[in-house]
């Protein structure tokens, strides 16, 4: 499938996301698997110097950016950082001017803000999946994230 854009009727999209990093910090990658009906799209990318948490966030941001119209999206992630950030911490960070409960600046704030903006375009449900536990979508996203690491390493 060339483009998984979503239709104007709020198409249902299932999305699996993952991030990987060798060194943490070090070369990292992100991967996304999206399915809508019979259509499927995969994406990956990477950075030469990054962290695992940044790559986890980038996977979701890039997956949502690829949807050109508002959709109903179920995001499957093995990242507690992303899951808790979006379902527990985000509202308080925003209320405190992007500060934690300890009054420290939120780490990766520009990525959290970008993710918040993308989530606002869609109806999003969050699902946590255990990593490396046989979930086929998560395993594919993990493989894509590792492709992103290799691309960042220049291989």
Swiss-Prot record:
Binding site residues for Mg(2+) 1: 18, 56, 78
Cofactor(s) needed by this chain: Mg(2+)
Keyword Membrane found: no
Catalytically driven reaction(s): Endonucleolytic cleavage to 5'-phosphomonoester
Cofactor note: Binds 1 Mg(2+) ion per subunit. May bind a second metal ion at a regulatory site, or after substrate binding.
One Gene Ontology MF term: RNA-DNA hybrid ribonuclease activity
Residues that bind Mg(2+) 2: 18, 142
Function description: Endonuclease that specifically degrades the RNA of RNA-DNA hybrids.
Protein name: Ribonuclease H
Organism from which the protein derives: Bordetella bronchiseptica (strain ATCC BAA-588 / NCTC 13252 / RB50)
């Amino acid at each position: 499938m060339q483009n998984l854009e979503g239709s104007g009727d709020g198409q249902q999209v299932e999305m699996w996301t993952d991030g990987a990093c060798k060194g943490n910090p070090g070369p990292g990658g992100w991967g996304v698997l999206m399915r809508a009906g019979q259509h499927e799209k995969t994406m990956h990318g990477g950075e030469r110097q990054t962290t695992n948490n940044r790559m986890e966030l980038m996977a979701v941001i890039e997956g949502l950016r690829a949807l050109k119209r508002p959709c109903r999206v179920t995001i499957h992630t093995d990242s507690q950082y992303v899951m808790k950030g979006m379902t527990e911490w985000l509202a308080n960070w925003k209320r405190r001017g992007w500060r934690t409960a300890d009054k420290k600046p939120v780490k990766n704030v520009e990525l959290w803000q970008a993710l918040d903006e993308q989530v606002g375009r869609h109806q999003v449900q969050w699902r946590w999946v255990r990593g490396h536990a046989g979930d086929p979508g998560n395993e594919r996203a993990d493989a894509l994230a590792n492709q992103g690491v290799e691309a960042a390493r220049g291989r």
